[in-house]
């Protein structure tokens, strides 16, 4: 990942992140391209929890079918979430993911804890779960645990961010945290599942 100077997320520094050109699939798929590749990650887990990053033809299959529903099933089976959580997960439709878009390379685990500052004052993004995904995956993760100041968010003003989409793109990290760390994450996960419809 590229570094930028400074210990704080200021508009100058964060805009360098916001203005990085999106890295898209080599053949530049179109939003309606059914052969566009979604996911494909060198990792097959999120932390210690297995997560399916198999290449898929659609965002829905990649995000909902292969990640959200299986993780919801694991959480329900473990007694960490009520049965209703799986019903909510399986009730998410393709329309709930917003307008069609092409896959871009995302960090995949972009929270403030995955930013380190070196002895020269440069910030580095570490521990990626990089894959071909939706840009909202990183923005939703940034919003989930905080740590990014208003200057950082102002750098993204040019993006057509639909805040209604944030919950659905927070589901994978919330479900992973529920499965890994227990039912303390259940209320937030259920709220995100309900808001994803």
Language-model-detected regions and their locations in the chain:
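ATP-binding pocket architecture of kinase catalytic cores
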Residues: 1-58
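Short, solvent-exposed loop/turn segments at secondary-structure junctions
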Residues: 4-7, 111-112, 129-132, 173
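Protein kinase-like catalytic domain
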Residues: 24-28, 160, 179
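Active-site catalytic-loop/activation-segment of kinase and kinase-like phosphoryl-transfer enzymes
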Residues: 41-93
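Active-site Asp-x-Gly
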Residues: 59-61, 73, 102-105, 112-167, ...
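A mid-sequence, solvent-exposed acidic-amphipathic segment
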Residues: 78, 82-124
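ATP/Mg2+ or Mg2+-diphosphate-binding catalytic cores
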Residues: 177-197
